[in-house]
């Protein structure tokens, strides 16, 4: 940006992503300051995170090869595109907690090349935020452009989440509203699609992970 009157303009960048080579729902390749990098998590928002990490590393004179090695040794962690198997289903668990974050995750799922079941878990505890009206500001209408075969809603505010996805225009005959997370997990196991995305608010994510650990789908550690 630049003002034609006073000359006020965007300052020269110290660190810059100059090329986005490829991006998928599980990885991205890009160029920062003439160095090639790859991260093993999906979505544009994680490239912003990577740019921040590279900027700090370069400030401390860490070589690009060392930075790239660090990226390759990192992996999706606790609730941040964490993947695990539920029976024969490949599940990805992603934390959502506000409209901007939810929209970024929906954009990331748009990159999935395969059909999937979408699970949305909405709680309203203090750690989640007791006001859940933010789901109406999130662009859940995007689900109609995704390869979603079925939606399962759960959590304390499961019925509100079900209403939100119905209002989005998604086929209500393909929405299952579940009162318990145990029922949600049972429904996941019954789905025809091989892939499942689970979007959960914070305490719903913790409760789901506890249930998954009880059934030995994940360990109980926050890695």
Can you annotate each of these PLM segments?
Residues 36-44, 90-92:
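A short glycine/serine-rich beta->alpha loop
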Residues 41-52, 78-79:
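Short glycine/threonine-rich catalytic loop with a Thr-x-Gly-x-Asp
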Residues 1-13, 55-62, 69-223:
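ATP-dependent carboxylate-amine ligase
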Residues 1-36:
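Extended acidic/charged loop-beta regions that coordinate divalent cations
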Residues 20-23, 35, 44, 98, ...:
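Generic structural motif
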